[in-house]
Amino acid sequence: VSTEPRTITLPTADYGDVTLPEPAWCTGHPNHQPDDQRADIHHSGPEVSLIWRGRHITDACIVQSPFTETDIPELSSRTPGVSVSVIARTLDPTSLYDLAATLDTYADQLRDLADQLDTLLGGGQ
């Protein structure tokens, strides 16, 4: 097992072949095309998906755009973040914890609605 940092070389339209460090969490670059710009190179980790009754609701994964020209943390950043597709944003740890807490609260509200519906359907109006 090599202890050397991983690197990858990707062809780009504006810089030719670009060699860059490949984070251990990156799962590769299957969607990269030779006519992509260097600024479009991004790393992404394994997706964590929310599936309900066989239906894909959303997913999230660690992402990083090492050459982004618009370093906007919620959209594209040199600093790794977690991209959450349902909100179309990339979050830092604090924001991700906040989203998780909000989803916990929402899950509680859904349970309350289920209880209300159960009462309604059971004739407990």
Describe each PLM feature range:
Residues 1-125:
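Positively charged, low-complexity terminal tracts
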